[in-house]
Amino acid sequence: MHLMYTLDAQGKRIYTLKKMTEDNEITKSAHPARFSPDDKYSRQRVTLKKRYNLLPN
């Protein structure tokens, strides 16, 4: 089982192990995406983010 979360009315995370809430909303994974040092496309991703001003200042 993986740790999942959903947001409450105040925007705080509510953690659960279920894939769906009682209101039939899909929960989100609480784990970050995997990182690979062998990422072949990181240069292209950074170039696109710079082009469209998506990088933090």
UniProtKB/Swiss-Prot annotation:
GO terms for cellular component: box H/ACA snoRNP complex. The keyword Ribonucleoprotein applies. GO terms for molecular function: snoRNA binding; telomerase RNA binding. The keyword Iron does not apply. One of its GO terms (biological process) is rRNA pseudouridine synthesis. It holds the Pfam family Nop10p. It is found in: Nucleus, Nucleolus. InterPro entries: H/ACA_rnp_Nop10, H/ACA_rnp_Nop10_sf. Residues 22-42 are annotated as: Disordered. It comes from the Eukaryota. Its main location: nucleus. Keywords: Nucleus, Ribonucleoprotein, Ribosome biogenesis, rRNA processing. Belongs to the NOP10 family. Non-catalytic component of the H/ACA small nucleolar ribonucleoprotein (H/ACA snoRNP), which catalyzes pseudouridylation of rRNA and is required for ribosome biogenesis. This involves the isomerization of uridine such that the ribose is subsequently attached to C5, instead of the normal N1. Pseudouridine ('psi') residues may serve to stabilize the conformation of rRNAs. The H/ACA snoRNP complex also mediates pseudouridylation of other types of RNAs. The H/ACA snoRNP complex mediates pseudouridylation at position 93 in U2 snRNA. Component of the small nucleolar ribonucleoprotein particles containing H/ACA-type snoRNAs (H/ACA snoRNPs). This is H/ACA ribonucleoprotein complex subunit NOP10. The gene is NOP10.
